[in-house]
Amino acid sequence: MKSAQAAPSSSSLALEFVRVTELAAIAAAKWIGKGEAKLADKAAVDAMRKQFNTIDFRGEIVIGEGAKDESHELYIGEKLGTGKGGLVRDIAVDPLECTDSVANGRPNALTVIATGPEGSLYHAADSYMEKIAVGRAASEVIDIDAPVADNIRKVAKALGKDVSEITVAILDRERHEKLIADVRAAGARVQLFSDGDVATAIATCFRDDPIDILMGIGGSSEAVLAAAALRCLRGEILCRWKPKDDKHKKRLHDAGITDFSTILRAQDLARGDDVSFTATGVVTGPLVEGVTVIHEAVTTHSVVMSTAPRAIRFIKTRHIN
């Protein structure tokens, strides 16, 4: 009598997804420092899509390069994979997070994939969200409605630190002037970063990283990608819609989102017990090192996380031409 076969999971395709982000990173890295953000992004998109379509699975983009009429590749609703095999996945991608960092040779650029079972990843309309993210030790103490100082004090207590030792990472934007002032008034440190709140949110989960909290307003797509990783690491992210203008409000209304006060947690953005997150560095940042080329060998550094099994792997790959 044959034993029942286990249902396929993301872990069975982990290395396949790593290969996707690796090739996208290598393609984008050729444009580092050349001032061509759009060409760097296109190189990553082309490489990512091409490799996805060699994998035996059935995937659908739920977060990608925009609507079908805005993008010809990796658009929302696009089907990926060969269609063979029993694995059906929601896919969220950022083929090149921090395109400007690549164009200008600044740190912290990644190629990113998050996956989950069909219907598991939040279909986030392209807008902005207010966010607060922390690692596992402080996952139950944050409150997006609480004053900044209260959240800092609670996180400090959860981490066994003095408030003066807490570092809050904030995207370096004019809209965050008051937030920066509030963090400093509370007695904590501020670490500003130019781009890349996915990697920065994840950094809160590693005790050897100086970042303790991510706060501020950033992209909704990045919130879903970060949530997938934080689910794997038992961290937490709290988000609330913060559309910047009437155009963004209309976009959300068209997507069926009318209550901007709803608080969304990691579990709301990346549901289920089979979530995965894969990223490869293009330019070195807080999560992984970037692409390096020595003679004829290209080296990539990637991170792979999953909730089933709950694990994190750092992968260094040397690609021999």
Describe the residue ranges of each PLM region.
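N-terminal subdomain of lithium-sensitive/metallo-dependent phosphomonoesterases centered on the IMPase/IPPase/PAP
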Residues: M1-A92, R153, K157, D273, ...
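Oxyanion/phosphate-interacting regions
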Residues: K2-A7, L13, A203-S221, L225-N321
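Short acidic loop-to-helix transition motifs that present clustered carboxylates
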Residues: K68-E70, R175, S194-A201
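Short acidic, glycine/serine/threonine-rich loops at helix termini
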Residues: E73-Y75, A103-R106, A124-S127, K178-R184, ...
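DPxDG-like acidic metal-binding loop motif
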Residues: G85-E97, S101-S120
